[in-house]
Regions:
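Alpha-helical scaffold domains
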Residues: 1-181
C-alpha cells in the first residue's frame, strides 16, 4: 500500500520522535510504504546491523532499498564487507542494496582495501554476463563510475582485472572517457 506521503513530510514526522528499535520494528511489519520509510528513519544506528539482512530480504521496491541503504546500511559495522556480501547473494534486492550501500560509502569518502576492490571488480564483471535486472545493472555501473571518479588509479586496476576475464569492458569506454575529464 502506498498513500503517497512525500519523503520530506515523512522525515518531519520521524524527527518528532526519538529513535526506537521496537517502534521501528513494528512499523516495518506493516506492508505500507510510509510505515517502512518511518521504520528506516526511526531505527537506531546501533541496531541497524541486526536487522539488515532481514529487512533487505523483505524489501520489494527500489525506493525503500534506496533509503535503507542511505540511512541504515551504510552505517553498520564493516558496511563495505557486508555490501559486497549482499552483492554476491544474487537474489531479491540484495545486490541492489549492496551496490547502493557501496555507492553511499564511496560518496562519504571510504576507500576499499585491495581485497574489497577485487571483490567489487569481480561483482562488476559477473554482472555484465548475468541476467540481473536492468535497475540493478544500472545501479552497479553507477557505483563503478562513482568509485572510478573518487579513487585514483582504480580505472587502470579495473581494466587490468577485466582484460583476461571478459572481452567486453565492464564500464563502456565512452563512460570512462567522461570520468577522465
Amino acid at each position: 500500500i502506498n498513500f503517497g506521503v512525500e519523503i520530506p513530510r515523512l522525515k518531519s514526522i520521524a524527527d518528532k520522535h526519538a529513535k526506537n528499535k521496537e517502534l521501528a520494528t513494528a512499523l516495518w511489519q506493516d506492508n505500507i510504504r510510509e510505515c517502512k520509510m518511518l521504520a528506516i528513519y526511526l531505527m537506531p544506528e546501533e541496531h541497524s546491523g541486526e536487522i539488515a539482512d532481514e529487512w533487505i530480504s523483505q524489501t520489494k521496491f527500489t525506493e525503500i532499498a534506496d533509503h535503507l541503504a542511505m540511512h541504515l546500511l551504510c552505517r553498520i559495522p564493516r558496511a563495505a564487507d557486508k555490501a559486497l556480501e549482499w552483492i554476491e547473494v544474487r537474489e531479491g534486492m540484495f545486490p541492489y542494496c549492496g551496490f547502493m550501500t557501496l555507492s553511499h560509502l564511496i560518496r562519504r569518502g571510504i576507500h576499499l582495501d585491495t581485497n574489497q576492490e577485487h571483490r567489487f571488480f569481480e561483482s562488476l564483471c559477473a554482472l555484465t554476463c548475468s541476467e540481473d535486472s536492468a535497475v540493478t545493472t544500472r545501479c552497479a555501473l553507477n557505483t563503478g563510475i562513482r568509485y572510478i571518479e573518487n579513487t585514483p588509479g582504480s580505472e587502470c586496476r579495473l581494466k587490468e582485472h577485466t582484460s583476461n576475464k571478459n572481452p567486453q569492458p565492464v564500464i563502456p569506454q565512452y563512460i570512462l572517457q567522461d570520468t577522465e575529464e
